[in-house]
Amino acid sequence: MVTGKELQNKALISLTDGKKVGEIKDLYLDGDATKVAAVFVGKEGVIRQKIWVIERSAIQVCGIDVWLVSGSDKIVNLEDVAGSQTFILGTDLRGREIHTQGGSKIGTLGDLVLDGEARVVGFTLGKTYVQGALAEKKGIVRGALLNLGSKDTPAIVDLPKAEASELPE
């Protein structure tokens, strides 16, 4: 398992010519935050800003030290990626409050936790406002989050499920 922060600044290397095509700046998740949809590599422009990404389908290996890309020509404008309007930037989830279904504050989302195939298995906890099993675990599995919320609304957790499950190591 690896966190989003651990992946920042990892090299993206082309399999075709061994060229470094960029670095992981952040991760775009699919709309349900279950897997990486694209890798954010940078942006340019002030007025007509372009956001550059590599689609997950172009990533061949999600390695420990580098991620391998199928070619050096795989960097595209986010606007040109199908479904990108629903993508969630990983750092946008950091600090988002987590509440129970009844409205009790649990804590805040910390960082993404990914498996070797760039699937989201859970989140670390940033802050915890409760004591007990969840606070000791310092993480929450993705399946325990019923709703990710938004910038203005908290994520909603199934507390019994969160307390009964463990993040893989």
Regions picked out by a protein language model, each given a short descriptive name:
Residues M1-E169:
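Peripheral interaction segments used for macromolecular assembly
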